């Protein structure tokens, strides 16, 4: 499991390291490395090719998406190897206790990859970096990044993954959240962006490094860290529009800087502003059970977080996940309930029913027209047939009449034969 609950300070005792029972979390350093020192990011490309490269697998010809997938696969394999070794040690030595989870290599936070270089190969990105940075020995302000002598240019195989990803503009998403989690002053009841407790139980809610629940012994309060992809959606439309405009302007500036090469200008780090998580502020004593109202400091400089002191909850005006979901291709998109569609369901059903009725009427009218046309064609064919039969009968009748006329003419023209024989009168008789 990725997140942890710290029960070390419940009894009020000091930390084993001698730091005492302090409720204040020490702020992290200003430089946020991409990984721990023992991670894959500290390897150079040559070491990575010798370690993970196989026959037909060249990291220079991969695009940036495939490179990140290979790095994540190597991280998972290294994490499994490092978690199996402490487990075997704990089984062999039960009295030694459970090793702290801080020594294990957890899954790194998701990397934000700019869309302009997501489909480019590693060699193309390296050439772009060389053309934009110019000569390595002539660049100013780059001390400590490379151990290459000034007379020779650094090659891709000698560069570490961390330096390459930093110069290419690939940034971990949880760096911004860790910087937001730093605590200033004596505010012991605030929100901690990342818990540095060494032991405890784990509950995973997304990113392992950011989701932790810590119980402190002196302030009797619970500190809840939620993943950066979750948040409460409220009606801060003006702030959301302003933030979207700022993000669009930053993205356009980065696109222009990538498309227009500058020989003496270094590639800027692609860091998009992210909203802080939902935080629980200091509890306030309330005499009655009603709502106490908003505190004096409605906006506590938390990048759009509206604080309500009566309930002890700091609520984001907009969803933290929506600020970075539009600017990168690999960040998770939060699930936002679309409540506006519920009121239009009746109207949509009526419109859909009308459309179905119109379609049925059109189909029935087309069928009736087809039947009528077929009946008309059939009648026309019958009429043509009857006309032909009538013409044939009329021809036969005319021929018969002509034959009768001819016979009458022939009989009238026939000559008379011998004289008719008549009975003679006889004079002989008995009287």
From Swiss-Prot:
Coiled coil regions, renumbered to chain: 372-411
Pfam families membership: bZIP_1
Tissue: Expressed in roots, leaves, flowers and immatures siliques.
UniProt modified residues of type Phosphoserine: 39, 61, 110
Posttranslational modification: Phosphorylated by CPK4 and CPK11 in vitro.
Any single GO BP term: abscisic acid-activated signaling pathway
Protein name: ABSCISIC ACID-INSENSITIVE 5-like protein 7
């Amino acid at each position: 499991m990725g997140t942890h609950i710290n029960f070390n300070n419940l009894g009020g005792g000091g930390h084993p390291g001698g730091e005492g029972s302090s409720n204040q979390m020490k702020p992290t350093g200003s430089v946020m490395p991409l990984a721990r020192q023992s991670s894959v990011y500290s390897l150079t490309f040559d070491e990575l090719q010798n370690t993970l490269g196989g026959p037909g697998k060249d990291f220079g010809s991969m695009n940036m998406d495939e490179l990140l997938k290979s790095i994540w696969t190597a991280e998972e394999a290294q994490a499994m190897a490092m978690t199996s070794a402490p487990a075997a040690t704990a089984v062999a030595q039960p009295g030694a206790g459970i090793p702290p989870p801080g020594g294990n290599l957890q899954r790194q936070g998701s990397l934000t990859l700019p869309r302009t270089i997501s489909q480019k190969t590693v060699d193309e990105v390296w050439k772009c970096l060389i053309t934009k940075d110019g000569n390595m020995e002539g660049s100013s302000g780059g001390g400590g990044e490379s151990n290459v002598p000034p007379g020779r240019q650094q090659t891709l195989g000698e560069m570490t993954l961390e330096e390459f990803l930093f110069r290419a503009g690939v940034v971990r998403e949880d760096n911004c959240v860790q910087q937001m989690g730093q605590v200033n002053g004596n505010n012991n009841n605030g929100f901690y962006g990342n818990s540095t407790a060494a032991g405890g139980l784990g509950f995973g809610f997304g990113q392992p490094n950011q989701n932790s629940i810590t119980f402190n012994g002196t302030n009797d309060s619970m500190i809840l860290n939620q993943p950066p992809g979750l948040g409460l959606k409220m009606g801060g439309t003006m702030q959301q529009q302003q933030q979207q405009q700022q993000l669009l302007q930053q993205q356009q500036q980065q696109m222009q800087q990538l498309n227009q090469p500058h020989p003496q200008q270094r590639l800027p780090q692609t860091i998009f502003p992210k909203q802080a998580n939902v935080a629980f502020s200091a509890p306030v004593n309330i005499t009655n059970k009603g709502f106490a109202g908003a505190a004096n400091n409605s906006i506590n400089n938390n990048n759009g977080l509206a604080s309500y002191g009566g309930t002890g909850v700091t609520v984001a005006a907009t969803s933290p996940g929506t600020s970075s979901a539009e600017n990168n291709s690999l960040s998770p998109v939060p699930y936002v309930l679309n409540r506006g569609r519920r009121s239009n369901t009746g109207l949509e059903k009526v419109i859909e029913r009308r459309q179905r009725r119109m379609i049925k009427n059109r189909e029935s009218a087309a069928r009736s027209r087809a039947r009528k046309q077929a009946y008309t064609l059939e009648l026309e064919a019958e009429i043509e047939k009857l006309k032909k039969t009538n013409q044939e009968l009329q021809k036969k009748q005319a021929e018969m009449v002509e034959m009768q006329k001819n016979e009458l003419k022939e009989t009238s023209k026939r000559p008379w034969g011998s004289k008719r024989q008549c009975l003679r009168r006889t004079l002989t008789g008995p009287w």
